[in-house]
């Protein structure tokens, strides 16, 4: 049974945390440590956590001397091949402070579409969690084709939440919530709560202009609905507010689950 309301976040037993490229790469690479701090805190209270992390391409770009996200697939794949290993190293280096070991899980959309592949992924994930390890999931950008632009892993995070029957899906980006209009405009209001099945027209999640990720309001709302439909509560907020979010404080936009 998923987390039915914000009040249950602080006691959620199985949590999927998704973080976007722009939040943990480039000038924001320093946010990995506080993100790990927050994950370690809920891990210490006994919760099981899966981290879905974008950022392989963005992390690999400087090593290929690229200033902007490459447009061609082959260079994206090359950047991902380099960046994924660096990204996992950075996470593990930070996790070492808490004695937590990460397990890398690279998936494509096809892995979760085919029943036998999905069962294999589920079995591996359950075993990692049972061993008190931290699965770090990313799309396998080095071999993916059109999936490489697949909503900056928002949909993948929702599918992983369904796969492991998570209580909570925490979608992190570099803006704090959904808004009724662009948040920098006068009169913009934060949308605090979205009831299951509620219509959302014209919502905004802000713009970062970083050019390193592919997600936006549409992909995040679609992912939130996908997870909520399966009974998982969803909170959308900024990476900077991850501690407050996991403590159940009143931040971000809450998507109530079915039931």
Curated annotation (Swiss-Prot):
Residue ranges of the TM segments: none
Keyword flag Oxidoreductase: no
EC number of this enzyme: 2.7.2.11
GO biological process, one term: L-proline biosynthetic process
Keywords associated with the record: Amino-acid biosynthesis, ATP-binding, Cytoplasm, Kinase, Nucleotide-binding, Proline biosynthesis, Transferase
Subcellular location, principal: cytoplasm
Pfam families: AA_kinase
Residues reported to bind substrate: 54, 141, 153
Location(s), subcellular: Cytoplasm
Keyword Chaperone recorded: no
Record: residues binding ATP: 18, 173-174
Known catalytic reactions: L-glutamate + ATP = L-glutamyl 5-phosphate + ADP
GO cellular-component term (any): cytosol
Pathway the protein contributes to: Amino-acid biosynthesis; L-proline biosynthesis; L-glutamate 5-semialdehyde from L-glutamate: step 1/2
Cross-referenced InterPro entries: AceGlu_kinase-like_sf, Asp/Glu/Uridylate_kinase, Glu/AcGlu_kinase, Glu_5kinase, Glu_5kinase/COase_Synthase
Gene Ontology molecular functions: ATP binding; glutamate 5-kinase activity
UniProt record similarity statement: Belongs to the glutamate 5-kinase family.
Role played: Catalyzes the transfer of a phosphate group to glutamate to form L-glutamate 5-phosphate.
Protein name: Glutamate 5-kinase
Organism this protein belongs to: Clavibacter michiganensis subsp. michiganensis (strain NCPPB 382)
Taxonomic placement: Bacteria, Bacillati, Actinomycetota, Actinomycetes, Micrococcales
Gene, per the UniProt record: proB
């Amino acid at each position: 049974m998923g987390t039915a309301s914000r009040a249950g976040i602080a006691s959620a037993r199985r949590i999927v945390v998704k973080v976007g490229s722009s939040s943990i790469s480039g000038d924001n690479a320093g946010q990995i440590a506080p993100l790990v701090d927050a994950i370690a805190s809920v891990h210490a209270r006994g919760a099981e956590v899966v981290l879905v992390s974008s950022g392989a391409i963005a992390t690999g770009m400087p090593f290929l001397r690229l200033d902007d996200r490459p447009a061609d697939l082959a260079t994206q794949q090359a950047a991902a091949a380099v960046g994924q290993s660096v990204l996992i190293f950075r996470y593990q280096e930070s996790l070492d402070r808490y004695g937590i070991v990460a397990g890398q899980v690279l998936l494509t959309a096809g892995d979760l579409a085919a029943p036998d592949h999905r069962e294999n992924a589920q079995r591996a994930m359950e075993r990692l969690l049972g061993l008190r390890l931290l699965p770090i999931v990313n799309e396998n950008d080095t071999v993916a084709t059109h999936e490489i632009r697949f909503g900056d892993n928002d949909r993948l995070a929702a599918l992983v939440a369904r796969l492991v029957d998570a209580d909570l899906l925490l979608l992190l980006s570099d803006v704090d919530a959904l808004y009724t209009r662009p948040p920098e405009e006068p009169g913009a209001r934060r949308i605090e709560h979205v009831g299951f099945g509620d219509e959302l027209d014209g919502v905004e999640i802000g713009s970062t202009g970083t050019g390193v990720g592919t997600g936006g309001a549409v992909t995040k709302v679609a992912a939130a609905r996908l997870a909520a439909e399966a009974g998982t509560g969803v909170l959308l907020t900024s990476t900077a507010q991850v501690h407050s979010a996991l403590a159940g404080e009143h931040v971000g936009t809450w998507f109530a689950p079915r039931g």
